[in-house]
Amino acid sequence: MTRFKFMLLSAACLLFAQACTQSTFEKYFEDKSLRIDYMSMGDAQSQTAVVHELREEPVWGGPKKNLIEPFGYGEYLLEVYDHESSELIYSRSFCSLFGEWRTTAEAKTETQAWYNSISIPYPKNTILVDLKSRNKADMQFYSIMQHVIDPSSMFIDKAPLAENKVVAIQDNGDPAEKVDLVFIAEGYTQDELDKFFADAERFTEALFNCPPFDTCRDQWNVWAVGTVSIDSGTSSSGVGIYKNTALKTGYYTFGLDRYLTTKDMKSIKDATWNVPCDAVFLLINAETYGGGGIYNSYACGTADNERTLNVFTHEFGHSFAGLGDEYFESTVAYESYYNLEKELWEPNITTLVDFDSKWKDLLPEGTPIPTPLNDETKDGIGVFEGGGYLSEGIYRPMDHCMMRDYAPFCPACSRAILKMVDFLSDKQ
């Protein structure tokens, strides 16, 4: 009887905690979105940001219980405070292409301003938005923009935007309790939209045939947004090809031919204004190898290269779960991307400064740290030198992984992915 009473008490406490968490959303937010468009400005040494535009949008697809992010990932952190009580009521971390640009040689001599956008649940009362940037010297976040927002302001745009054709490839239920993945068409003309929707279905099946995504398919919704481009394909400025496309993607980001991205965050957000959205993949109607993935921003890749599906999964690992690159043999545009004196925020690479916070608990007993790469260790989990674009000073969990060379995700990456799935589907 005592055990039965304890079980009842535990269940009651759990239900009470869930009710309190749910009421936090109901207390502070409405079931729609506030989109905050802002300009990031700066160079390699410093940066700031200013709000450009605010929009009310009809759908909030994110979790309603998990409002405060626990991961500590990313180069930026958005914190939302109730203005009256100063209580932290929402937070999300992310990265941006502007943040990457700041690590290039160009940023040492130029100052630029880039457009960016992030959405939060729509507040019921006045809020303070605090945008912070990570300082690589100490890996802490420092404020670069604070802005007070009155949700009743007449200056918040409420106009509907263009409605594209949206197909539910997989609808498993309430967006607040599912991860909502959105494929957006890029470089598909009106006559090519049928191909886009077929491509999106093909990519969906590829994702859920890949461990660990194959174990959690029921926690996902998948949507395809048929944005129409005037031109077919994508730009490739390095060889003189320029296309008029919906999202303005192109190869040669930072001068690197395979790095395929876009600066046009406004068009991405415009395309998803009426669709629940936790993760975005820009599906580009092209054959040439290329892609990119930016944590909690977007990933993109081409539809028809022979390595397309592997590129998709790799880049999605970046954008969805904050996974770092584990390769160290290829050319990149970044300079001094990581501070080797501090621990890295990505869950699958380490400097060993704070390895206890990484995948140490996944290692078999007696595994040497670092782990020598030999015939006995090459197929198992360990701490192998080389990763994060450097052959020395950064370590990866396995010799081969999706984040290095398109092998299956290693245990450290898989755990990080599943934690993010549970967080975004309100299961944590």
Regions found by a protein language model. Give the residues of each.
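Catalytic Zn2+-binding segment of zinc metalloproteases
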Residues: 316-332
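Fold-level signature of zinc-dependent metallopeptidase catalytic domains
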Residues: 154-214, 224-234
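Active-site-proximal segments of metallohydrolase catalytic domains
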Residues: 219-295
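Bacterial Sec-dependent N-terminal signal peptides
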Residues: 1-24
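Beta-strand-enriched, solvent-exposed domains that form extended recognition/catalytic surfaces
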Residues: 28-154
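Short pre-active-site segment immediately N-terminal to the catalytic Zn-binding motif
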Residues: 193-196, 291-315
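Solvent-exposed loop/turn segments at secondary-structure junctions
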Residues: 187-190, 228-231, 286-290, 306-308, ...
